[in-house]
Amino acid sequence: VVRAFADTLGGAGVDYEIIIVDDGSSDETPRVLERLRSEVPALRVVAHPSNEGYGKSLRDAFAAAAKDYVFYTDADGQFDLAEMLAFLPLLDGGNAVVGYRVGRAEGALRRFVSRGYNLLVRVLFGLKVRDVDCSFKFLPRRELQALGLHSDKFFIDTELMVKLKRAGVPVLERGVRHLPREHGRSTVSPTHIFTTLREIGGLLAERRKKETGPEPGPRTSEEVD
């Protein structure tokens, strides 16, 4: 994946950096990344001593980013990274361009759950994107780093898109081919459903708090009738 990024972006003449988050891996990943750093000078590694979650990994990568735009994707080979190049002309310096999966290489149940979840966030948050969890997104770095993201889990994609909407960041969508998984396996489990429901409640409460404003403080003696 690192070499594919470097070949794709370097060949296009793009000023880039590559940030890999090693989320507490217990295999040969740290040594592989160390070797790659000598081959790819643009590579930076953020290492977690233990597994801290998908959302925390993304938040740490976002915080470490230094270029004008942040692109993120997973390392499981389900996207052709060359499709990034078709997104570049759509960037205008302050907008986000997010992918939606075309020809999803997943089972019927997974597709059904995804459609239901996208409908849910559309109803609850007015979020009019086709595929909120598609991990193929270009985001303006300054606006991204100012969002105040909190999720450590898979809800990070939804929180990100909801807060981009609240911040008034324009969002464009573009289809991206979805390929069978090449590496690893999905770590989503039934417990993530309950975590997501709890985080949805928290984000709704945050919205209500912003809409109603802060609780009024105690009045001074001059304000008392």
Language-model features: where?
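Short, well-formed alpha-helical segments that are part of the catalytic scaffolds
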Residues: 1-9
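Terminal low-complexity segments of carbohydrate-biosynthetic enzymes
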Residues: 3, 198-225
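Conserved donor nucleotide-binding strand/loop of the catalytic core
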Residues: 16-19, 30-64
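Residue-level recognition of beta-strand->loop/alpha-helix junctions
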Residues: 20-22, 47-49, 100, 175-177
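A conserved acidic beta->alpha catalytic loop
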Residues: 22-31, 77
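Acceptor/aglycone-binding surface of glycosyltransferases and processive sugar-polymer synthases
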Residues: 48-64, 69-72, 78-154, 181-203
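Short active-site alpha-helical segment characteristic of glycosyltransferases
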Residues: 79, 156-163
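Catalytic donor-sugar/metal-binding loop of nucleotide-sugar-dependent glycosyltransferases
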Residues: 128, 149-152, 161-179
